[in-house]
């Protein structure tokens, strides 16, 4: 994702474009945010195309497993909700309608549900839980009762790798090399057996967990130099 984002950045360079954010990959495309809108390009970063154009901010694009759809969050109507649109472009469909902010996090492995984070059932506004909503709409379902800010489901949907703590501030990756009691770990929960596995956690920032086969990968600054993949 980083390489493709850099390639796209090079493609935009002749136009003086900067700050391409939140990249997500499908088999053939790269989605990213630029200027508060959702864009896609070829996987190699060429042929960028703008999918959304609205005064409100659109962010957190995530491809469906088959790459045909993009789920994203948007602040239309002065509220942040979950939306769905074809990855080739077209009209967006609103999936959530709650007054709390709903931020897209990913997809269920079968591509039938969008996973999002929300504080809708939390007394304070500084914590989130993970929910799912069907792509055809309907009532949202909570993945678990525990606080979670982001997570990724295993291929069979039985386990969730997630970050239970917020970052040191509300940005996407926290303060660089922050150390202290609030540094977030990555945990794995078996949703059927309700068994929790805590990945050994130094005093470091660890986030963005994802599954690759039976293994969980995540970003961490535990080597005290920069953020790397572990």
Language-model regions, residue ranges each:
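A flexible loop/linker signature enriched in serine peptidases of the S9 family
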Residues: 14, 33-39, 53-58, 71-83, ...
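Beta-strand-rich domains and repeat architectures in extracellular enzymes and scaffolds
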Residues: 14-43
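Glycine/alanine-rich phosphate-binding loops at beta-alpha junctions
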Residues: 48
């Amino acid at each position: 994702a980083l390489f493709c984002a850099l390639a796209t950045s090079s493609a935009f360079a002749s136009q003086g474009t900067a700050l391409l954010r939140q990249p997500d990959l499908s088999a053939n495309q790269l989605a990213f945010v630029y200027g508060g809108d959702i864009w896609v390009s070829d996987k190699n970063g060429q042929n960028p195309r703008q999918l959304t154009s609205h005064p409100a901010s659109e962010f957190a694009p995530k491809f469906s497993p088959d790459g045909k759809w993009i789920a994203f969050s948007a602040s239309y109507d002065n509220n942040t909700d979950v939306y769905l649109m074809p990855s080739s472009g077209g009209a967006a469909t609103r999936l959530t309608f709650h007054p709390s902010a709903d931020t897209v996090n990913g997809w269920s492995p079968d591509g039938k549900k969008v996973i999002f984070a929300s504080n809708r059932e939390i007394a304070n506004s500084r914590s989130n839980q993970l929910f799912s909503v069907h792509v055809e709409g309907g009532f949202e379902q909570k993945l678990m009762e525990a606080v979670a800010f982001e997570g990724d489901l295993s291929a069979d949907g039985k386990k969730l790798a997630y970050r239970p703590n917020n970052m040191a501030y509300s940005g996407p990756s926290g303060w660089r090399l922050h150390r202290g009691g609030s540094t977030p770990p990555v945990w794995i929960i078996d949703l059927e057996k309700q068994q929790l596995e805590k990945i050994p956690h130094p005093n470091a920032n660890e986030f963005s967990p994802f599954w690759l086969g039976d293994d969980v990968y995540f970003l961490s600054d535990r080597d005290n130099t920069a953020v790397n993949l572990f």
